[in-house]
Amino acid sequence: MKLFDSHCHINDKSYDRDRKAVIENAKKADVHAMMVVAITEQSANKAIEIANEYSQCFASVGIHPHDVKTCSENVLSTLIEWSHHPKVKAWGETGLDFNRMFSPQKSQEKWFIRQLKIAEDLNLPIIFHERDSKGRFLEMIRSYDPNERKGVVHCFSGIKKELKGYLDLNYDIGITGILTMHKRGEYLRSLIDYIPIERIVIETDSPYLTPAPEKNKVRRNEPAFVRSTFLKLCDIREDDPEYLAAILWKNTIRLFEILEEEVTII
């Protein structure tokens, strides 16, 4: 069995002392590939460094909505240049986050549209971030949709209406450890049967959102723990683990246009 953590931040400084061990832990948990996701120019550079060093790691470049207050065309030009690296497989994460407004809404919307255009020009799938945008995110991607684009709505925790909107746009749905949480994950669990199996990918969003089975043991999430989310998904869907793992793997490499031979299974 092989699992793919479709969204992690092991480029975060909290892994600087034990990153190699974290990647070893992932392999022991059958997590044989991971997408290291950027949120800033600096984190994009680190993601590419990690992808260069570890064959099972891939990278994205992009600016998170929290960080667009410092975005500029110069920053995006640098990211565009880096996007041509062979291990860069996606643009993101980008989107809208109105939860705590670390960047003004006007700036978020401006740089979101700009990054959509860049990803389209580069023909890269998009890793979307949406939180508490009250319908504005869907409104924007529906109005700016020049072509069918590949993308994933990472860490989905929205309502059924939003889920339908994303599926109608042919986006994949990223499922995190929220699925395992007793109260917080209750509504998400109720929506799982509405997501076609070919549209699901799993993720940790580490170091955040530690799944329930690990939450009382460790503070920091890591790619190995995507296995807990996977097993909960198997339980909800009543799927055989080998069967579901194979489908989720295919979904993820299709999304990021990764060839099987690009992933070294050790």
Label each residue range with its predicted role:
Residues M1-I266:
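Mid-domain alpha/beta scaffold segments of enzyme catalytic cores
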